[in-house]
């Protein structure tokens, strides 16, 4: 790490050949290797042993560059998919390590620019803003007063060259970009990195960091348009908007303002909208406004044209849906969110006369969708497609305590994440499925009936399915059912959830 600090001084950040020499430094790959082991992203999960040689990595990179200049095939023929060795070494392991090293090296210019930008400036630093649940209080405060929302699926680039062309405006090191381009094009299992799921894409577990970096950079370039819009609209010049925007952007977006102003000045009037709010998670984004349907249609066509003209991405208009918040539920971050009218009758009395006043207010609701959740449980073999609990034969070889702990942890994860649901009835059903599935798994293991096993186990099975809040009410107020009921009518957002991992992959 000390050697890295010596080499990464700000004075060299402007040199064109800054990144290229770092590709041959062994400590870069040692850093990537150690970070990967700590995060359990590769090597351990991929089934490789922990034997690793920095010298082999350096030889492979030298071999790569030699083949690149000779215009020969780099590793092996694309048609020869069964070959597993590079110069006698493990293909998957060392190719993966080269990608991880590239990820560390390419991130360096962005990190240095970030330090330079933040120097002498105060920025709100809060770990709570990393939580997925931090989005929902924002939606509660803003979306209840809006009319329409654009449900956007950000298109995935279908060609590697789009990644490289976008990256070249940031990384001025031509040698490194040529090496990166050659490696990506010659790597024979590029398609295995992208797993197509219906209308979206996701990354496989191998080389996640590097391709997440490329994809997130690409998405941030998409979002550069919103900096331009904020600077052009007086109503969007708010500290809160700027703070949240800077959390999801690279700071070069500010430099794009002049380009957008020059090319889109004629249609700038479309965006003079004081109530404009944008949130994104992964490839899904929501853009809400208080404007009319006509305004949202203009937004839709503008975004599609912007993607096609500046990023050469063919985006089908059906990937952007226009929905009215008052009669549509948003499927976002695992919740079904909607805006509904809440009617309140107030009795008013003046001297001898009394009358009723009806007040209507909008309220932002979040519910747990039961059908997709039962589908996930069915896929994991906890129940059938109708939601009837089943035993888990794969866990029958475990000890009783491990089986109960696994089922209980899955429920606690679900309960923790869906604590923001206004109605907990669906969560009760999930709890019932997991508890009965746990009981049937234990009964199957001991060759007994569910009734007999539950009678023998007693409350021991139930305790693992209590959340921390439920345990407090159960131990202190066991008879206060009304007080306990208040717990299930509350909506709680936790600010420690940084990823969605309901099922706790034990397979």
UniProtKB/Swiss-Prot annotation:
Keywords: Chloroplast, mRNA processing, Plastid, RNA-binding, tRNA processing. It is found in: Plastid, Chloroplast. InterPro entries: Domain_X, Maturase_MatK, Maturase_MatK_N. This is Maturase K. It comes from Kalmia procumbens. One of its GO terms (cellular component) is chloroplast. Belongs to the intron maturase 2 family. MatK subfamily. Usually encoded in the trnK tRNA gene intron. Probably assists in splicing its own and other chloroplast group II introns. GO terms for molecular function: RNA binding. GO terms for biological process: mRNA processing; RNA splicing; tRNA processing.
């Amino acid at each position: 790490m000390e050697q890295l600090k010596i080499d990464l001084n700000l004075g060299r950040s402007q040199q064109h050949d800054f990144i290229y020499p770092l590709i041959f430094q062994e400590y870069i790959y040692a850093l990537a290797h150690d970070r990967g082991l700590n995060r359990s992203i590769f090597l351990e999960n991929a089934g490789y042993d922990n034997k690793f040689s920095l010298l082999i990595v350096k030889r492979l990179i030298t071999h790569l560059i030699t083949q690149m200049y000779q215009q020969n095939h780099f590793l092996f023929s694309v048609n020869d998919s069964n070959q597993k060795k590079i110069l006698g070494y493990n293909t998957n392991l060392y190719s993966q390590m080269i990608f991880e090293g590239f990820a560390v090296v390419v991130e360096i210019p962005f990190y240095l620019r970030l330090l330079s930008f933040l120097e002498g400036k105060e920025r709100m630093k809060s770990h709570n803003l990393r939580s997925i649940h931090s989005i929902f209080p924002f939606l509660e405060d803003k979306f209840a007063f809006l009319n329409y929302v654009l449900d956007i699926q950000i298109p995935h680039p279908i060609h590697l060259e789009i990644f490289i062309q976008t990256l070249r405006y940031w990384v001025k090191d031509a040698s490194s970009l040529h090496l990166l381009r050659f490696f990506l094009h010659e790597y024979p299992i590029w398609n295995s990195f992208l797993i197509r799921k219906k209308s979206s894409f996701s990354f496989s577990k191998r080389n996640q960091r590097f391709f997440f970096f490329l994809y997130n950079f690409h998405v941030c370039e998409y979002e550069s348009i919103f900096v331009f819009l904020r600077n052009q609209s007086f109503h969007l010049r708010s500290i809160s908007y700027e703070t949240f925007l800077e959390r999801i952007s690279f700071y070069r977006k500010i430099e794009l303002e002049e380009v957008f102003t020059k090319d889109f000045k004629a249609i700038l009037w479309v965006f003079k909208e004081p109530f404009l709010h944008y949130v994104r998670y992964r490839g899904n984004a929501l853009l809400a406004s208080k404007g009319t349907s006509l305004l949202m249609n203009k937004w839709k066509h503008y975004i599609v044209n912007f993607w096609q003209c500046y990023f050469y991405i063919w985006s089908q208009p059906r990937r952007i849906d226009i929905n009215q918040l008052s009669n549509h539920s948003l499927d976002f971050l695992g919740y079904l969110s909607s805006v509904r009218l809440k009617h309140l009758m107030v009795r008013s009395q003046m001297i001898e006369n009394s009358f009723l006043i009806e007040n209507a207010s909008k309220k932002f609701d979040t519910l747990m969708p039961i059908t997709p959740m039962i589908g996930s449980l069915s896929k994991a073999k906890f129940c059938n497609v109708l939601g009837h609990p089943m035993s888990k034969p794969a866990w029958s070889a475990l000890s009783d305590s491990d089986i109960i702990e696994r089922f209980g942890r899955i429920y606690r994860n679900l309960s923790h994440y869906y604590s923001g649901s206004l109605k907990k009835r669906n969560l009760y059903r999930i709890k019932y499925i997991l508890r009965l599935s746990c009981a049937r798994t234990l009964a199957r293991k001991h060759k007994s009936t569910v009734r007999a096993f539950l009678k023998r186990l007693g409350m021991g099975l139930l305790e693992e399915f209590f959340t921390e809040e439920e345990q407090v009410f159960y131990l202190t107020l066991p008879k206060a059912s009304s007080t306990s009921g208040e717990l299930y009518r509350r909506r709680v957002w936790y600010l420690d959830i940084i990823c969605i991992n309901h099922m706790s992959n034990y397979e």
